[in-house]
Amino acid sequence: MADLTCTTPFLLYPSLVIILFFYSINHHNQIFSSVVDDDPSCRLSSSPQAVFSSFRIFPFRSSSSCLNITSNNNSTSEVVVVEEVDEAVERIEEGLAMARAAIRKAGEKNLRRDRDRTNNSDVGVVSNGSVYLNAFTFHQSHKEMEKRFKIWTYREGEAPLFHKGPLNNIYAIEGQFMDEIENGNSRFKAASPEEATVFYIPVGIVNIIRFVYRPYTSYARDRLQNIVKDYISLISNRYPYWNRSRGADHFFLSCHDWAPDVSAVDPELYKHFIRALCNANSSEGFTPMRDVSLPEINIPHSQLGFVHTGEPPQNRKLLAFFAGGSHGDVRKILFQHWKEKDKDVLVYENLPKTMNYTKMMDKAKFCLCPSGWEVASPRIVESLYSGCVPVIIADYYVLPFSDVLNWKTFSVHIPISKMPDIKKILEAITEEEYLNMQRRVLEVRKHFVINRPSKPYDMLHMIMHSIWLRRLNVRIPLSQ
């Protein structure tokens, strides 16, 4: 057996944090422990074999002894009675089982369609083109999500460290999602934890770094890690929800570069926890079967949901374009080979004043999207908005929504080692192939637009769908 414990006392935190943001925690600061079953059959599978091949969903955990959590001995009146929790779990799991069956049936229908060469007009908004791994299963899964998916946000903690995030600029997805679920009229907002499919830990990573770390005298992640870890300690002592699943139906969401480091302090505690991250680097611990890859999007003020058409394909005479700072090793290599060296592949570190960044993307067939300090880049979404085929230059990057989107049909991937051959690779793409990719860019970009309130198949819905898929891969057992 292994105990998951938090050892950092709250008295070590700055008084500002204690007074303003953790006023309730000192009443519930006993560290929780959970019993982790060492039976190999109960461990989360690392096998990539898919239950739904179109989604790359991984094998369900069905053993009744899995996720066996001991109840907290120090229960209070705020802790939900186990019998009531079991009834709620049973009801939710029955609904999820029905959803899985419906999605499987849709997948079988897709196989019959392929055999019979019939059309897929009944799929509706996701019917056209080949941007999806399986349009039928995606459409059915989205329908099931709208019917059954509910998110409960824990109420503990106060703004700005919790329940508040940026609504604009590079980390805006954190605040937009949080605001949609907490303050909007989202259909996915649970009325009570008993009807929740998943549980949202509303930690504001950006604001923690902004308010706790300034002035920046140290970039050590321990303060960030301790705040999140102690928050989990609080909610796991107060409620049974974390303990019954070992966090497998809990998630947090952040686009900040530091967000992946939250779990580094205690890998066992976060072993099953869903992390929704922009920095989806599989070489640095991002696990596609558990974690969610977020699109990185830069939202200017007053431009929410902004998409422009760009030039039609026949007017795009420039082969490829990139302009951006020398952030990280990938871009240094890009500049070494291509910076202001070719008239067909225009690469700038500092864009000349005579050029307009957006208009240059509008004129290019392909837009280079090299990694910066981390693997993700907002240029992928910017390319889609401009109708420019994104050229993703990154290794180990798990692309957003790759459970349902077939990125190969509307983007080009060039490994870092092949950067000297960028022009050769792009020129080898035929005009017909390019036109097909560009058409699919226009089709798929609806999934990368943020609307408030969220709309079916937009970016926020797609993020929720990614979380929904991870929840479909979990079966929570009833108490023994």
From Swiss-Prot:
It comes from the Eukaryota. It is a single-pass type II membrane protein. Glycans are attached at N68, N74, N119, N128, N243, N281, N356. It is found in: Golgi apparatus membrane. Signal peptide: none annotated. Pfam families: Exostosin_GT47. It is an enzyme of class 2 (transferase). Its EC number is 2.4.-.-. One of its GO terms (cellular component) is Golgi membrane. The chain crosses the membrane at residues 5-25. Coiled coil: none annotated. PANTHER family: EXOSTOSIN GT47 DOMAIN-CONTAINING PROTEIN, EXOSTOSIN HEPARAN SULFATE GLYCOSYLTRANSFERASE -RELATED. Belongs to the glycosyltransferase 47 family. This is Probable glycosyltransferase At5g11130. It comes from Arabidopsis thaliana. The lineage of its organism: Eukaryota, Viridiplantae, Streptophyta, Embryophyta, Tracheophyta.
